[in-house]
Amino acid sequence: MTIYVDADACPVKDEIIRVGERHQTEMLFVCDGGLRRPNSQWARLVIVEGKLDAADDWIADHIGAGDVFVTADIPLADRCIKAGAIGIDPRGKLWTQDNIGASLATRNLMTDLRETGAVTSGAKPFGPKDRSSFLDGMERVMRAAAAKKA
């Protein structure tokens, strides 16, 4: 099992490292640059260059069944689920086969509404409650991935 992190704008990198170390699990922080190497023997920084979604493409090409992913990117979450991985977003929302379709539809609707100017606000600020929800959810994801592997 490996934890894949869509790291460019991830606000919970430190929490991922804590959980990954506790479970002694390899963590790959994938980005397009600008991040420092995570301070953990279990973590590796993967820098991909090129087109806009190069980090997403790298994760989708390397992730597999039983792996874990952390991303707020709904299309990437969909690709990872289709590969058999288990995931969570930085606010603690579990990505599942049951909710990814509705999440994609909502994302597409909101994109259309923003383009027409009907919606101008974005996501609410990330706070301590989100961080706590992520830690709880990440532990559940790790247990589910370990059970799937066994």
Swiss-Prot record:
Parts of the chain that traverse the membrane: none
Source organism superkingdom: Bacteria
Matching NCBIfam families: PRK00124.1
Family: Belongs to the UPF0178 family.
HAMAP family linked to this entry: UPF0178
Protein name (database record): UPF0178 protein Mmar10_1466
Naturally occurring in which organism (per UniProt): Maricaulis maris (strain MCS10) (Caulobacter maris)
Taxonomic lineage: Bacteria, Pseudomonadati, Pseudomonadota, Alphaproteobacteria, Maricaulales
